[in-house]
């Protein structure tokens, strides 16, 4: 598996604002909780960028990334209600 990297400052901001960091994402990737992996829908603005959908505790997180021959670089972590409905059938709704 390729080395997974990220911006340290971005990681701190994500932990503070969203309660999840890139280390958590790597854990779930290694655990096999990738629900989908596709090209970013806006290739004009984000060329060569892909998005992993990671399932964590019945919730879907979108993780945009770029990959080269040496590494996978994670860009951000986006909790997604819409993806959760798609991949978990709205299980989180009370």
Across the structure, where does each feature detected by a protein language model lie?
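Ribonuclease/tRNase effector modules and their secretory precursors
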Residues: 1-94
């Amino acid at each position: 598996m390729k080395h997974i990297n990220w911006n340290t400052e971005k990681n701190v901001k994500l932990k503070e604002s969203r309660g999840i960091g890139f280390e958590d994402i790597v854990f779930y990737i290694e655990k096999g909780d990738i629900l989908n992996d596709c090209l970013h829908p806006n290739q004009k603005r984000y060329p060569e960028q892909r998005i992993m959908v990671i399932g964590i505790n019945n919730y879907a997180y979108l993780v945009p990334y770029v990959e080269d021959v040496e590494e996978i670089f994670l860009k951000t972590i986006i909790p997604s209600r819409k993806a959760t409905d798609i991949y978990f059938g709205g299980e989180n709704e009370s």
